Amino acid sequence: MLPVSLYGASGTELDNFFSVLPTLVENAYDDRPYQETLFAITGNDAIKHITIADSWDHQTPFDWPEDLLMEVGMAVQTIKYPDVGLLEHLMTLDNVDCRRLFIWMHFETNVYPIYTKEACRGLDKLGLPTPYDPNDIATYGLYVQRIEGLKLHAPAEGMPEIGLPRARILQLGLERY
């Protein structure tokens, strides 16, 4: 039985996706910069974690006043997966969109998926229209629902055990599908 977030998906395409997923991501564990970033996130210093994630993503470092640093840090530490709406106000900061914001959250929590145009295209191929609009948190929320539905629907043999977050495995698999 399909989770509600996957209604409309092609059963054949889903089966095909999960049958090839292990092959699509077999080299994913070899991404040293990603791994080093993932394992560099320790402790509770959300601002330090954001800086590490931004470095991985080749973003210009932020220069925020102390009060804004505290607000961002509290927001990042307070939100619980799969919630996304509570972070929408952070998108008013210069050069912060859904993509950048949820790269922070991916590394902070290991569960939020990284938002990419290519992964949204992969979902489209599965019969799950998922727009990519980094300026609209609602489209990212839909993306999270789709990824979560895939996690729930995945057959045991379809999700390889390679030491990476399942959200990352699915994101990379969708990009390469």
Q: Where does each model-flagged region fall?
A:
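C-terminal accessory module of base-excision DNA glycosylases/AP lyases that mediates lesion recognition
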Residues: 1-54, 116-177
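Phenylalanine-focused residue identity feature
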Residues: 17-18, 29, 39, 62-64, ...
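A short, ordered amphipathic alpha-helix with a cationic face
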Residues: 24-25, 75-79, 109-110
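Helix-hairpin-helix/helix-loop-helix acidic hairpins
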Residues: 47-94
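Catalytic DNA-binding helix-loop module of base-excision-repair DNA glycosylases/AP lyases
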Residues: 85-126
